Amino acid sequence: MNKVQIWEEKVIIPTYEAGKPDKNPMFLEKRVYQGSSGRIYPHTVIEKISDEKVDKEYTALFLENDYLKVMMLPELGGRIQRAYDKTNGYDFIYYNHVIKPALVGLAGPWISGGIEFNWPQHHRPSTFDPVEYTYAENEDGSATVWMGEIENMFRTEGVLGVTLYPDKAYIELSAKLYNRTKMPQTFLWWANPAVAVNDDTISVFPEDVTAVYDHGKRDVISFPYAEGTYYKHKYDHVNIAQYKNIPVPTSYMAYRSDYNFIGEYDYGKQAGLLHVADHHIAPGKKQWTWGCGEFGKAWDLALTDEDGPYIELMTGCFTDNQPDFTWIQPQETKNFKQYFMPYKNIGYVKNATIDAAVNAEYDEAEGQLTVSAYTTSVQKGARILITLPGENGRQEKVLYEETSDLSPEKTYEVKIDREKLQQIPAYTEGEQNGTEVLCGLRVCV
């Protein structure tokens, strides 16, 4: 076991600098901004961004193990700026090589890319402000960066721990929110990872997500194949999980799901991102895009120089929609965990934990069932078991069983011909990537 490396380093990042704060406080009480208050005093408001790019020095915090390298910027809201998979050279979080703000945030400047942590309102009032930080090596060989603040709007306290473990290909987030006041307060928490997109990418929502909501649940449409008008655009059985099929700026949030994951996959690069968290604590599963049309392309140019389009896969804790706030009582602390991990070579995931992700697809034309798996650590002699549930409480039927060595560097795949699957009673008429998904199949790793 190799210990996780942790260090602080000065880095130079090309930057379009924000202007000076307005000296006058602003109390925009009736501002319509996803339920957030415009009364952000004592935060100052910045309303100008420079058109000139300069090299600027930032303090960066790094975590690195055998599989991942993570960079954080405490001077910019404590965001994760880069998350890099060393096994395949893939940035599983959108890596914006420049700091190029636009006036999107609650107090003005906001940047795309990385993972932003939105609280107590959206977008985070201090998203462009420095936060306090410290870091430590832990006894088990892991290492943690702690970043936090006492936010200015409600005087509540938020602390986030970012941890890497030895020999684990995932990032653990440990959040602690504390109401240090004598009054009940409201908050929301949405971790906001950006992912690079192109014509080969698809958002990976659990299979029980069959409808999605707009902000405030003011509109709803079927998912993934949209039928009807949404954001004033007409869809006729179009897969809106694919970036290339959404021409206009669009948000959607899962109506409900009993699964603990959400993600994205790039079929061109055969790699993607997964977020894993207890869906009872973190029910929020959202996608936002500027759209692939001309409006979206203009925003790409406004937010980056060369890194192209992205989408946001926001993950909400204690809420499934924006705006939807949660109460935190006087002296109450809320603790919760979220996990982000890369994966590769297995396509549109059907289920995932922090230990493994699995996919199963049946190709009617080829007459083959393909089962694949990815693990976040070395699993020697892992048992792969494919079963069908028995009828009327009977024992499960074992379709296939094998042992194999798996790791973040070595994924698993098996193809089972139709002749071996005669006992399968039925399959669903799914349309994900031209394949069909078996009904009732269980894959255990």
What are these regions (language model features)?
Residues K176-M183, A373-T375:
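Asparagine-centered strand-capping/turn motif at beta-strand->loop junctions
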Residues L406-Y427:
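Aromatic sugar-binding surface patches on proteins
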Residues W327-E332, T403-K410:
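Short proline/glycine- and polar residue-rich coil/turn motifs
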Residues G367-E402:
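Beta-strand-rich binding/interaction modules
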Residues N2-Q5, E9-M26, L61, M71, ...:
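A contiguous, surface-exposed recognition patch within enzymatic or periplasmic domains that forms
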Residues I346-Q379:
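Surface beta-strand/loop "capping" patches
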Residues I384-I386, Q422-V445:
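Short, aromatic- and glycine-rich surface loops/edge beta-strands on solvent-exposed regions
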Residues M26-E64, S112-A169, D199, K297-T326, ...:
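Extended, loop-rich substrate-binding clefts of extracytoplasmic carbohydrate-active enzymes
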